[in-house]
Curated annotation (Swiss-Prot):
SMART domains: IG, LRR_TYP, LRRCT
Chain residue ranges for the region called GPS: 681-730
Positions bearing carbohydrate: N72, N78, N89, N145, N150, N324, N424, N582, N632, N661
Residue span of motif PDZ-binding: 1364-1367
Keyword Transmembrane recorded: yes
Record function comment: Endothelial receptor which functions together with reck to enable brain endothelial cells to selectively respond to Wnt7 signals (wnt7a or wnt7b). Plays a key role in Wnt7-specific responses: Required for normal central nervous system (CNS) vascularization where it functions cell-autonomously in the tip cells of sprouting vessels. Has a role in development of dorsal root ganglia. Acts as a Wnt7-specific coactivator of canonical Wnt signaling: required to deliver reck-bound Wnt7 to frizzled by assembling a higher-order RECK-ADGRA2-Fzd-LRP5-LRP6 complex.
Ig-like domain: residues covered: 230-332
LRR repeat positions: 70-94, 95-118, 119-142, 144-166
One cellular component (GO) term of this entry: Wnt signalosome
Name of the featured protein: Adhesion G protein-coupled receptor A2
Feature type site, description Cleavage: P356, R357
Domain LRRCT: 178-228
Organism, scientific name: Danio rerio
Length: 1367
């Protein structure tokens, strides 16, 4: 079945036929080969009919087309993008008209001579992007008219100078190549193109050497084209290139390819550095080297039967006339059953290396630790260093090679850099000082190579000691610093590299080059090493004695003052005298000096035939660390056990002569520096044990020894020491601890006693001390942190000999100092908030916003958390910031700025901002109060004579006392006013800062300045402690009461508190009748306003329960009351009442009946009809006669009684009542023994001060529940409303209404007597009590019961009139 036929339009058929005819008519011979032929339509030739352009590009031709097939007039031939490999001789013969030949992008590698013959008209030839390696002048024969030649992109690396000799018309040439080497082989290029008409194209760039890479060749000069420098080959490869692991018997071929540099270039093979030759018996077949395209040379090596011996490095070596180079590959030949080396982790001074599980016979490589500044390769990349480790055939790790890796320790790496530096006379002193600066930290050396590198540098510097005398001083200091290195590290350095022997040799020969006729003496001092050298004449030698000594520490005769180097006192020194003297170390004649060793050389030291000049040198070492016990004693192996050097080591040596064998012995005395027993005399034999050195007992004899000094007699010149047996369990070496001045310890103890007195008192008597909850917390924490700071300072500031303890002391001091300042700041904020909430703006009627409750934990997070964070960060960054190389346990200087001084300054600044704000609030409040008093005085209300005012006590006898002016003072929940609290806190901060500064100066300074600041510290500490304990304990009445309450006989001896308790201060001047008629019922006298501003409750409680308690309001002897009132009125000035009672209760301002939680804004009316029910009573009424008699006394002594029913309008005019809330922060009202004595109402308030909200209820605290206001009588409620609307209004009408209400109340009450109306009102409101001790007659039942155990409540438990003295 055939598909549908597609019909081609007729006109399309005609067009195709015409096209084919046209092609066939132009070049019919090329139609079968796929080439195309077109006419040349260039303007230069107006007759294009005879000129042809043939294009055979991209036709996959493998050779050039036959010339006979091309048109005769072919002017352009395109053979690009084919696969032509060779141009034969005469390939284009006959194309005499050809002007352009394009042969680019082929595979041409060979051009035979005469390939372009006959192309006399050729102008452009493109041979780019082929594989031409050899170019000769014969290749371009016949191209006489060629103007443009492009041979770029081929594989040649250089060109023959005569290559373009046949091209006479050449104008432009390009021969860029990726292998083009711009060296001496192309030195002809600049002159050739400069002298001829040809031009080198800009595309011709250099590829090699690297210094000329990508630079245009035409811009280079002949001097740039040189063959100097290392040989760089554009090609050098070895296959296989990676490490090969093969088994025994395998076949392994190698193929090496290299650049053909010159005619003598050759390839050779090596195995493990040994030449390899062809040996068929061993399976080694080596082929001859072959050259390719005049560019490459190759060689092949075949291992037909690999043996185990073939393991190792196989290397292909390229030898040229300009040098040799090579590449290699590692071959590992394994047995058929191979083992493995286990995985292993190694930590050393080069870093941490993890060697993996490796097959036996394999070398494993690990990258070195990358440092901050890695080295760069010549190519610009990062040079990756490696460590190697071989796993032997038995499956065991060999020693690794870490030489290419850098040291991880900074000091070690720097010392290694010094080793690599060249030393000469110009830089020797500079390098020596730099090395010496790094040896200052020798105590922290942890590697033996540190000691080794310093020893090697000292040996290098010895070559320049003669011309640079300063070097000897630096070398002695280097050796002295190295004696601080740990004993074990020095011992290992001696065993491994004999580093200690090298150092000792350098020091003991240091003076020889510097002694001559013009410099006959040399002395060098340091802390641990001292050297003395002399040029002597043996013929005149009479003996010499040299003593090593040092200054006593802190000697009075020391000349070292502030600013001088204190280490000069501890330097070792020599004192030499001529003649032989038996100098005793204990009787050393220099004042304030300690002799450590002495050596006496006899007069017969030199033989008779000694040379005329001789050099004598003494060297003393403070200890024997440079002379470790690397092995047993020479000749006395049994004495080497558990022995150590217990004395300094002193050396005596000669240069240029020797000791006479018949000389008298040398006498050496040495002082013991460590305990031990069984001493032996020894000298150091540097030649023993293969020049490692050892102590020898031959030649020295111990002639005397005691606890402190040993004397030796030796017959050889050497290093001398005394060896003692070390105990089996030696005690830890005692580290000297610097002791502060005794006044610091004494006065710190006084300060701690005072502070802990405060802390213990406020903790044990928490519920008895009237202080806000926040103030209680801040006071205890401030005291505790001040105690911590002073105790840690006195006990640990000088413990620098114990690094860990010293760091802990520094951290604790840092924390406690900042925390103390923060707690003082928190206290300042608390006072400021309290002052802010008592400003007149809120007292005059602004509605107080109910604050939200906030926990006390925030204070601890600020005052304790912030210092903890600062200290933690400081210690985490570098724990050595505390007590590192400083004589006290504190922060080092530079980190202390950001970690302590700046935060401390900010804390003090913020604290003083709070202080200033508090002062501003208090000044504003005092100004408003003075204005209120002036307003009250400008509109007085006349009191009738029948109402002599009882001042603040007037309202105590009425139920509307919540709106009466009962000494409306501030209800600060502290005995001190805000002003006193603020001033005390300022003084505390100032004295603490002074205490801290004096302590710091006492530690920092020395001698007299230290004593001065120690005394200042003691005085400041004592003053701070006394001030705090006086202010917070002795001057507080509640603290006194709490202390006295601890005495067993205090309650039984305390007098009745209710006999004479004057109440409040009357504003203005009172008449005699008014003062004499005042009746004070169980209230306290007003005193100095700055002294008493107690609240009706304590805020230090944790309870949230509000219990209403009152003080005993019992009336006792009325006559006594009248007499006391008359006496008080006569003694006290107008407006002031003075207390005369000795009871503690009388010294506390209380408020007997005024509810402290009474709001004025919403006065509530409530009928007071509750009565106290019957209960157990201890006292009963004694009859109406006695009560009637008391009533007469009351009338006779009290005058009119209506004044007691209500205050005047003047007293009401300037009183502000603010609702008081109990909260979890400021404490709750509670029924406790401590509060029973003071009751719920405060009588001791200042005139004109409102019942301000405590700071605890401010923004820092919240209400836990509002108290319900006490109910008021109707007249009282109306009067309260009138007081809010008009402050300066007469209250006489209100007083009459209040009296009437009181009279009705008295009739209703259970008063035992039927008195007249004017007396009944007073008594019924004040003295009616129930058998259970509750006052009745007011709208609130007030509890007056108490026990003997109560501190402040010594009230009666019966009715008011019982148990009274009858007058």
């Amino acid at each position: 079945m055939s598909g549908p036929c597609v019909r081609i339009p007729f006109w399309v058929r005609v067009f195709l036929l015409l096209l084919l005819y046209r092609i066939a008519a132009g070049c019919p011979e090329l139609f079968s080969s796929g080439c195309s032929c077109t006419e040349d339509r260039s303007k230069a030739h107006p007759t294009p009919g005879t000129r042809r352009k043939v294009s055979c590009g991209g036709k996959e031709l493998t050779e050039t087309p036959e010339v006979s097939l091309l048109p005769n007039r072919t002017v352009s031939l395109n053979l690009s993008n084919n696969r032509i490999r060779m141009l034969k001789n005469g390939s284009f013969a006959g194309l005499s008209s050809l002007e352009k030949l394009d042969l680019r992008n082929n595979l041409i590698s060979t051009i035979m001579p005469g390939a372009f013959l006959g192309l006399t008209a050729l102008r452009k030839l493109d041979l780019s992007s082929n594989r031409i390696g050899c170019l000769t002048p014969e290749m371009f024969q016949g191209l006489t008219n060629l103007t443009k030649l492009n041979i770029s992109g081929n594989i040649f690396s250089s060109l023959d100078p005569n290559v373009f000799m046949e091209l006479h018309s050449l104008k432009l040439v390009n021969f860029h190549s990726e292998f083009l080497s711009c060296d001496c082989g192309l030195r002809w290029v600049p002159s050739f193109f400069r002298s001829g008409s040809a031009r080198l194209g800009d595309e011709t760039l250099c590829a090699y050497p690297r210094r000329l890479q990508n630079k245009p060749l035409r811009l280079l000069r002949e001097s740039d084209l040189s063959c100097e420098g290392p040989l760089e080959l554009h090609t050098l490869s070895l296959l296989p290139s990676q490490r090969q692991v093969v088994f025994k018997g395998d076949r392994l071929p190698f193929h090496c390819t290299a650049s053909l540099v010159d005619k003598i270039t050759a390839l050779h093979w090596r195995q493990n550095g040994q030449p390899v030759t062809s040996d068929p018996t061993k399976g080694i077949h080596l082929e001859e080297s072959v050259q390719h395209d005049c560019t490459f040379i190759t060689s092949e090596l075949i291992l037909s039967n690999v043996h185990v011996e073939a393991s190792g490095e196989w290397e292909c070596v390229v030898s040229t006339g300009r040098g040799n180079t090579s590449c290699s590959v590692e071959i590992v030949v394994l047995e058929n059953s191979a083992s493995f080396c286990p995985e292993q982790k190694v930590n050393n001074n080069r870093g941490e290396f993890r060697w993996p599980r490796t097959l036996a016979g394999i070398t494993s490589y690990q990258h070195c630790l990358q440092l901050r500044y890695p080295s760069l390769t010549l190519g610009g990349g990062v040079e990756q260093k490696k460590a190697s480790r071989n796993c032997d055939r038995s499956g065991r790790w060999e020693e690794a090679d870490y030489s290419q890796c850098l040291y991880t320790n900074d000091i070690t790496r720097i010392l290694h850099t010094f080793i690599l530096m060249p030393v000469n006379a110009s830089n020797a002193v500079t390098l020596a000082h730099q090395v010496r600066s790094y040896t200052l930290e020798a105590a922290g050396f942890t590697d033996t190579v540190d000691v080794l590198y310093v020893a090697q540098m000292m040996h290098k510097f010895m070559d320049y000691v003669t011309e640079l005398r300063e070097l000897s001083e630096v070398l002695v200091e280097m050796g002295s610093n190295l004696m601080q290195v740990d004993d074990q590290i020095l011992a290992r350095a001696q065993r491994e590299e004999r580093a200690c022997s090298s150092i000792v040799y350098t020091l003991e020969t240091l003076a020889w080059p510097q002694l001559h006729s013009h410099a006959q003496d040399l002395s060098r001092y340091s802390r641990n090493i001292v050297m003395e050298a002399h040029l002597i004449r043996p013929a005149h030698f009479t003996g010499i004695s040299c003593t090593v000594y040092q200054r006593r520490e802190g000697a009075a005769g020391s000349q070292v003052h502030d600013g001088a180097d204190l280490s000069l006192e501890q330097q070792l020194r020599f004192r030499c005298t001529t003649g032989t003297h038996n100098t005793s170390l204990n009787a050393f004649h220099l004042k304030n000096a300690v002799a450590l060793a002495t050596v006496s050389l006899p007069a017969t030291l030199f033989p008779p035939n000694a040379p005329p000049d001789c050099k004598l040198q003494f060297v003393a070492f403070r200890n024997g660390r440079f002379f470790p016990f690397t092995s047993n004693f020479t000749g006395h192996s049994d004495l080497a056990r558990r022995r150590g050097i217990s004395t300094p080591v002193i050396y005596a040596g000669l240069d240029g002569c020797s000791m006479w064998n018949q000389s008298d012995p040398i006498i050496v005395s040495l002082r013991h520096t460590s305990p031990g027993h069984d001493p032996v005399a020894a000298h150091w034999n540097s030649q023993a044990l293969g020049h490692h050195g050892s102590w020898s007992l031959d030649g020295c004899q111990l002639i005397h020894s005691d606890v402190s000094i040993s004397t030796l007699r030796c017959s050889v010149l050497s290093n001398y020491a005394v060896l003692q047996e070390i105990p089996d369990f030696p005690g830890s070496p005692s580290i000297p601890v610097e002791v502060l001045h005794p006044v610091i310890y004494t006065c710190t103890a006084v300060l701690l006693l005072c502070l802990f007195t405060i802390i213990i008192t406020y903790i044990l008597h928490h519920s008895s001390i009237r202080i806000t909850r926040k103030s209680w917390h801040t006071l205890l924490n401030t005291s505790f942190h001040v105690a911590m700071t002073s105790a840690v300072f006195a006990g640990g500031i000088t413990l620098t000999g114990y690094p860990i303890v010293c760091q802990a002391v520094g951290i604790v001091l840092h924390y406690s100092s900042l925390s103390t300042l923060l707690w003082i700041g928190v206290s300042a904020r608390v006072i400021y908030k309290e002052a802010l909430l008592r400003t007149p703006q809120q007292l005059e009627g602004e509605s107080a916003v109910q604050p939200t409750q906030r926990p006390m934990l925030r204070f601890y997070l600020i005052a304790g958390g912030v210092p903890l964070i600062i200290c933690g960060i400081t210690a985490a960054v570098n724990i050595n910031n505390y007590g590192d190389n400083i004589p006290y346990c504190w922060l080092v200087w530079q980190p202390s700025f950001g970690a302590f001084y700046i935060p401390a300054g900010l804390i003090i600044l913020v604290t003083w901002i709070y202080f200033l704000c508090t002062v501003f609030c208090l000044r504003q409040r005092n100004f408003q109060e003075s204005k209120d008093l002036q307003c009250s005085a400008s509109d007085p209300s006349n009191l009738p004579e029948s109402q002599p005012a009882l001042s603040g006590s007037t309202s105590l006898l009425s139920t509307d006392s919540g709106v009466s002016p009962v000494h409306a003072g501030t209800t600060v929940e502290d005995q001190y006013s805000l002003k006193v609290q603020c001033l005390a806190l300022m003084a505390t901060q100032f004295v603490f800062v002074g205490l801290w500064c004096c302590g710091a100066m006492a530690v920092w300074h020395v001698d007299r300045e230290r004593k001065l600041f120690s005394c200042l510290y003691g005085g400041t500490a004592t003053g701070l402690g006394i001030f705090l304990v006086l202010h917070h304990c002795f001057k507080r009445l509640d603290v006194q009461a709490a202390w006295l309450g601890c005495c067993p006989g205090y309650h039984r001896s305390q007098p009745m508190p209710a006999y004479s308790h004057p109440c409040t201060v009357t504003v203005g001047v009172q008449s005699a009748s008014e003062r004499g008629s005042q009746l004070f019922v169980a209230c306290h006298p007003p005193t100095d306003p700055n002294h008493y501003s107690s609240s009706a409750r304590s805020s230090s409680t944790q309870s949230g329960t509000a219990s209403i308690t009152v003080v005993p309001s019992k009336l006792t002897n009325l006559l006594q009351v009248s007499q006391d009132n008359a006496n008080n009125a006569s003694r006290a000035p107008a407006g002031t009442n003075t207390n005369t009672s000795t009871s503690t209760e009388n010294n506390k301002p209380t408020n007997n009946l005024l509810p402290s939680l009474l709001p004025v804004q919403q006065p509530q009316r409530r009928k007071a009809c509750s009565r106290t029910k019957g209960g157990n009573t201890q006292y009963h009424h004694r009859g109406d006669a006695r009560s009637h008699y008391r009533l007469k006394a009351l009338r006779a002594g009290g005058g009119g009684s209506m004044g007691a029913l209500g205050p005047s309008g003047t007293e009401h005019s300037n009183i502000y009542h603010v609702h008081k809330h109990a909260s979890s922060e400021n404490g709750s009202l509670r029924n406790s023994h401590s509060e029973g004595q003071n009751g719920l109402l405060t009588n001791g308030r200042h005139r004109g001060e409102g019942l301000a909200t405590s700071p605890s209820e401010g923004s820092d605290g919240g209400s836990s529940g509002s108290r319900k206001p006490f109910p008021l009588l109707p007249s009282v409620a109306r009067r309260a409303a009138m007081q809010q609307n008009a402050q300066c209004r007469s209250a006489s009408k209100d007083n009459l209404k209040l009296a009437a209400a009181a009279e009705r109340e008295s009739k209703r009450s259970s008063f035992p007597l039927n008195m007249s109306s004017n007396v009944t009102a007073t008594a019924s409101l004040s003295t009616v009590s129930a058998p259970n001790g509750t006052l009745k007659g007011s709208v609130v039942e007030l509890d007056t019961s108490g026990t003997d155990q109560s501190q402040g409540s010594v009230g009666m438990k019966s009715r008011v009139w019982k148990s009274e003295t009858t007058v």
